[in-house]
């Protein structure tokens, strides 16, 4: 209050590059979205989004990502981005009855999954192949920088295991104990050599939390390697070779890749390399050249400077 338009504009411009501002100001309803887009959404689109909201479908899009849209209708083709933000009639119709798109992602206590793997209780570890398993932490990594309409884990948003209520996703005290148990699964398996930390989105975890997760992975890799030194030839376990972080934030929220995060990635690479890990990868999902902005390019440069690779 009391600020001129120019003063407000300068203040928002100063906040724009802070990922916390972007998350705090994210659009969460159809009416907010239409207002942000200057009332450019059709009545059919608004009806569909309102129907989705009534069915409990979450909506979440940051000002940064929405700024990539063309609201004039006379500029460039932004259909690729709109397809990520706006839900299809088919998705809205089936929401509430969605099951796991991959049968292997169905985890039942005490029973092997469809790929034959017996997994720890809960929904933290998923596995389809002998050499790789997915880790989904009980942290803010169960959220995303936006909800992709094509998300393969839409059933997890449906069950609210994944959501955008950030305060409820902050790790509880018991998470540290649970993380140790989950690391035991990787350590005691003879074939696993690749861990993919995802969600949600791996980079949505707070820096302190992500550091703790990576340090737990590093300690596990070291223990597994030392145990192997005591095993005879022919009985050695696969050692951890690759660590991947699944994240769309370089496209959705590139300002999340700040200096502190880069230092965490660099420190982990140095420590994990000493215990035999050879590949460090951010696995992202750029879907259109419209997402390759100056901010995204800077985020990629920072990640590469930490010695990590980018795959898309």
Each PLM stretch: what is its role?
Residues 46-50, 195-199, 285:
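Glycine- and acidic
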Residues 141-144, 158, 202-204, 289:
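Short strand->helix junction
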Residues 61, 118-156:
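N-terminal pre-triad scaffold of radical SAM enzymes
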Residues 129-133, 147, 189-198, 243-246:
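Glycine-rich, often proline-containing surface loops adjacent to acidic residues and nearby aromatics
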Residues 1-129:
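Flexible, acidic/Gly-rich N-terminal and inter-domain linker regions that tether
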Residues 143, 154-195, 212-215, 219-223:
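Conserved alpha-helical substructure of the radical SAM core
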């Amino acid at each position: 209050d009391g600020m001129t338009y120019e003063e407000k504009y300068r203040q928002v411009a100063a906040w724009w590059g802070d990922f916390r501002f972007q998350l705090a100001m994210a659009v969460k309803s159809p009416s907010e979205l239409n207002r942000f887009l200057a009332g450019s959404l059709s009545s059919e689109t608004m009806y569909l989004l309102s129907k989705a909201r009534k069915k409990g479908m979450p909506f979440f899009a940051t000002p940064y990502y929405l700024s990539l849209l063309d609201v004039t209708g006379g500029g460039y083709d932004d259909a690729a981005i709109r397809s990520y933000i706006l839900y299809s009639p088919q998705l809205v119709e089936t929401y509430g009855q969605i099951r796991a798109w991959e049968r292997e992602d169905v985890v039942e206590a005490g029973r092997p999954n469809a790929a034959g793997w017996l997994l720890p209780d809960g929904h933290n570890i998923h596995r389809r192949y002998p050499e790789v398993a997915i880790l989904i932490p009980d942290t803010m990594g169960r959220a995303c920088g936006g909800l992709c309409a094509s998300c393969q884990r839409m059933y997890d948003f449906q069950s609210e295991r994944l959501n955008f209520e950030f305060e409820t996703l902050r790790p509880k005290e018991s998470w540290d104990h649970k993380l140790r148990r989950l690391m035991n699964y990787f350590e005691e398996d003879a074939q696993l050599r690749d861990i993919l930390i995802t969600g949600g989105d791996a980079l949505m975890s707070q820096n302190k939390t992500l550091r703790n997760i990576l340090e737990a992975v590093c300690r596990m890799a070291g223990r597994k390697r030392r145990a192997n030194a005591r095993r005879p030839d022919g009985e050695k376990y696969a050692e951890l070779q690759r660590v991947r972080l699944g994240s769309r934030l370089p496209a959705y929220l590139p300002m999340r890749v700040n200096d502190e995060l880069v230092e965490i990635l660099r420190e982990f690479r140095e420590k994990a390399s000493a215990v035999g890990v050879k590949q460090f990868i951010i696995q992202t999902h750029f879907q259109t050249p419209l997402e390759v902005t100056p901010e995204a390019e800077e985020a990629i440069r920072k990640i590469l400077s930490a010695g990590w690779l980018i795959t898309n």
